Amino acid sequence: MIKKTTSFRLAIFGGSFDPIHYGHLICAMDCLEQISLNKIIFMPCSRSPFKKQNPVASALQRLEMIQLAIKPFKNFEVSSFEVQSPAPSYSIRTVQEFHKLYPHAELFWIIGSDQVPGLPRWKDYAELIQIVKFIVVSRSNYYPYEKRDYLVPLPKIRYVDISSTEIRERVKKELPIFHLLPQAVFQYIKENSIYIPNRTVHEK
């Protein structure tokens, strides 16, 4: 298992981020503070092996939206590793790469509690849990999971009921979204007509 003697703690926050919103940022900040992390890497995926559909926004658009959203946070960074790698995005490949880049760091991966039961189906699961620990963020309507050494529960949960799917649907219906994500991301979606071509993203 991962040794606990290292002083640098790095977490990878993977997802589609299609688009990134306040829920992602609050979750990341809670993990940073409660798990005493030094850095969080936002890792947009090209396509999840567990999802049939590709993200709606392009890889470049999602990277740029993340960059805009995390600009005020000095401990947050974004990586293009997965979107530049062949699809689908496998976590083991990402973890191996960051283990090489940060050989002396203690590595974590942020996941929702609903993902815990499916972890054994992740590619090279046995190797994965030797390299990385999973910070588990509990979500509503999901039962407690069995304790494991490689699972690190987030002590205090600030559940924010926002989803990227909801935001995309609101854009389609011409409903306001400015209250769900950072202003810079809202402006980017509006200016680039993301999620619904040739129509205006309404401010009110």
Swiss-Prot record:
InterPro entries: Cyt_trans-like, NadD/NMNAT, Rossmann-like_a/b/a_fold
EC number assigned by the record: 2.7.7.18
Transmembrane annotation, as ranges: none
GO terms assigned for molecular function: ATP binding; nicotinate-nucleotide adenylyltransferase activity
Alphabetical keyword list: ATP-binding, NAD, Nucleotide-binding, Nucleotidyltransferase, Pyridine nucleotide biosynthesis, Transferase
Gene3D superfamilies per record: HUPs
One Pfam family matching this protein: CTP_transf_like
CDD domains assigned to the protein according to its UniProt record, in alphabetical order: NMNAT (cd02165)
Enzyme class: transferase
GO biological process: NAD biosynthetic process
Substrates-to-products reaction catalysed: nicotinate beta-D-ribonucleotide + ATP + H(+) = deamido-NAD(+) + diphosphate
Pathway as given in its UniProt record: Cofactor biosynthesis; NAD(+) biosynthesis; deamido-NAD(+) from nicotinate D-ribonucleotide: step 1/1
RNA-binding as UniProt keyword: no
Similarity section: Belongs to the NadD family.
Function of the protein: Catalyzes the reversible adenylation of nicotinate mononucleotide (NaMN) to nicotinic acid adenine dinucleotide (NaAD).
Protein name: Probable nicotinate-nucleotide adenylyltransferase
Organism: Methylacidiphilum infernorum (isolate V4)
